[in-house]
Amino acid sequence: AVDNLSFDVKKGEIFGLIGPNGAGKTTVFNCITRFYKPTSGDIYFNNVNGKTVHLNEMKVHNVIKEGIVRTFQNVELVWELNILDNLLVAAHSSYRSNFFHHLVHSRLTKREEVIYTKKAMKILNNLDLTPYTYAFPIGLPYGVLKKVELARTLMSNPKLIILDEPAAGLNDTETKELSEFIKKIKDEYDVTIFLVEHDMGLVMSICDTVCAISFGKKLDIGTPKQIQSSKVVQEAYLGGE
């Protein structure tokens, strides 16, 4: 549960939400992306058109159209499709063609397939994932799969990417590579990153702002350095000195 929690995520920053298990971190994500419906409070978002929208009553698929995408703790790729096709599936919400167009393989469908295939190939190239273009997820290193999942979020032209424990299951080397990967995505694609993560090394090394919560309530918010030195956070989350 979340109790009277309020914060702002600024455009272009990497914002980290930390707290013990059960603190309400994933609940916050689920409320923003409309998997959960908040019983009180308001969630506002400055969308892809620069308009402030109220997310509380919005449907899940419309949240994506507004420019918000997310990943989950576990890799959610389609194992029967190669990496390129996994990216193309993620572009589905951007297609103008409908089921009938796809059924008859209309000119619009063909044109969109060319456009989005080029886009996917460009993303894979920009993020140094080209060697895996036609590979299938099964058998690939877990660190690569995490990167592919992040690359896939870019297919819908997001403004905000929400990452739920992106470093979960990664070793130290993979985590370091992922942190650089996240920063590269933020810089090259001009997106805002909002992440929940238990790996404090990753959080403190890449986040511009960190918000610490416990039992659904905000403990403190500030720069990584400020949070590391916060007595409230040390006592509630880090166990004090």
Positions of PLM-derived features:
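Glycine-rich phosphate-binding loops of nucleotide-dependent enzymes
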Residues: 1-241
